[in-house]
Amino acid sequence: MVRGRQFLAARVYDTARAGMSSTIIQNTRPNVPMWLKALDHIPPAEVLTRPYPIQHTEPKDRGRAAQRPRNLFRPTKIVHPEDQLRQEFYRDHPWELARPKLVLELDGQDARRRDWSKGLRQPGMAVVQRQLWYMEVRGLSKARAYDVARKEFYKLRQQEEIERRVAVEEARMYGAYFGKNNLQVGMELEDAAYEQWKKWATIEISKLEAERTAAYANVVDTVTEPAEDDEEELL
């Protein structure tokens, strides 16, 4: 397995010590080479692979600056149990953010003085408070409380929509005119934008056709010109 390899360097220390032990001239000190002491501490390896020494990580001395308290005067983040519930509700119902809300409060504790056991008073943020009441008072899980409060919210929205439709029908029976709704206004704006784009597209198409016709005419002219020159030379 080790045929053709030289291992004489593995016994260089023994050879050097043996050479220094026998002196030709008596009463003289042998000249010790400088590398002999280093070779005594770090002898040559007896295997063909170099051993990898164990790496010891020294503890990092960060100094006294690391022991000082940080963010001592920074205010802590205020977290309420309703925050996560509110985030989940508005993630599932993003259009509720577009509805007008009553933001006028006395001291910011109006929601705590309400009796949430009697159902929803104002949809939206009230769904979160109703869900929290189910979790704290009734002991329901988070998903179950959200499901119950959400169904109450849908039922209340359906009642409001039915009342609104009935009121509009009754008013129209007495001759009231409400004008265009949001859907009709949006369709008119969309039609106007489409007609404007149609005019622009027609102009662009005519420009492209004119450029294509002009390019074809130039190619025909360059092909017919040499033929006319040949006829003139023959004449």
From Swiss-Prot:
Q: Which domain of life is it from?
A: Eukaryota
Question: In the UniProt record, does the keyword Flavoprotein occur?
Answer: no
Q: Give compartment(s).
A: Mitochondrion
Pfam families annotated for this entry? MRP-S25
Name where it mostly resides: mitochondrion
Q: Which UniProt keywords apply?
A: Mitochondrion, Ribonucleoprotein, Ribosomal protein
Is Membrane one of the keywords? no
User: What GO cellular component entries does it have?
Assistant: mitochondrial small ribosomal subunit
Give the residue ranges for region: Disordered: 51-71
The protein's matches in CDD domains, at most eight in alphabetical order, are given as:
At1g26750
Q: Which GO terms describe its molecular function?
A: structural constituent of ribosome
Q: Which InterPro entries match?
A: Ribosomal_mS23_fun (IPR016939)
Subunit structure, interactors included: Component of the mitochondrial small ribosomal subunit.
Return the similarity comment: Belongs to the mitochondrion-specific ribosomal protein mS23 family.
PANTHER family, per the entry: 37S RIBOSOMAL PROTEIN S25, MITOCHONDRIAL, SMALL RIBOSOMAL SUBUNIT PROTEIN MS23
**Could you tell me what this protein is called?**
Small ribosomal subunit protein mS23
The source organism is Chaetomium globosum (strain ATCC 6205 / CBS 148.51 / DSM 1962 / NBRC 6347 / NRRL 1970)
Organism placement in taxonomy: Eukaryota, Fungi, Dikarya, Ascomycota, Pezizomycotina
